[in-house]
Amino acid sequence: METQPLLTVGLALYNNESTISEALDSALNQSFTDFKIIISDDGSTDSSFEIASQYAKKDNRISVFRQNVNLGPYENWRELSKNVNTPYFFFLPPDDIIHPRCFENAITIHESNPNAILVFPKAVFMSYDGQVSTVSADSDIVTSNLNVKDRLIKLSTNTHACTAVYGIYKSKFLKYIPLDKHIMALDLLSLFTAAIHGDILATSEVLFYRRHREVDETPEETMSRYVRWRIYTPTRYSPYARFVIEHFKAVLKAKNISIKDKLAVIYKLSSIFGTKFQVSKKDIVLQYLYDLIILPFR
């Protein structure tokens, strides 16, 4: 019987021909080598699939498959998560680069912290041509020594940059990532959900380099792109109403939080998200009623 490695690296690919080689090289050059890479190409129209396939021919740790139709980012990530049968999982963005000690350091932290559900590499931004900056791409969301209620409040208050979502997870958590939710800021919801199930920890040094797309987009253009990529389903209410509702649902479903603490967290979230995302309680209630009563019949 073939022994499975400790870590699966998942890469969701779509038209990344200019950066995919750098991303894969950075993964293959890790000091920690007990991993495999699975690549799901979402119907790229450039040479991304061919480049990935060439890598797979040279290294038997890599497997590549191609979707028959374009699924969109969330569905493609979900396809990747279905193929994980190792203790740990890492989402490798096809645009970014990881330091050679990234896997080693994160796995070491996991192994010495049984309650950790996610260990993310500290990150800085770099330009699209590879110029590394000193600007942090992180948020203060390390939750060591916090109870679950305080973890959730810290996540909701402090999360702005979501690079931490590209960390190493315990694979048992993947079933909880709500990739079927076409809402704004799903990465924030994913981190919030992780904090329900365990600690979020970080490496002590910068081990992740996140490419910063310097795109001059208006909010309307960004929203249009999210709709086109099937990241977000338009609604007549605040774009963040469903986002808030899904946070409430995650809290209410959690089995490790008392009723008293659930109510305290939901009350706090209403205030935090109302300020951060300018979403009113009225929009939250109306969106919930719409989804409950009207949406099933559309």
Regions found by a protein language model. Name each.
Residues 231, 235, 241, 245, ...:
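Membrane-interface aromatic/basic loop that binds lipid-linked glycans or pyrophosphate carriers
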Residues 220-232:
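A solvent-exposed, charged loop/short amphipathic helix patch at secondary-structure junctions
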Residues 2-223:
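Nucleotide-sugar donor-binding/catalytic module of glycosyltransferases
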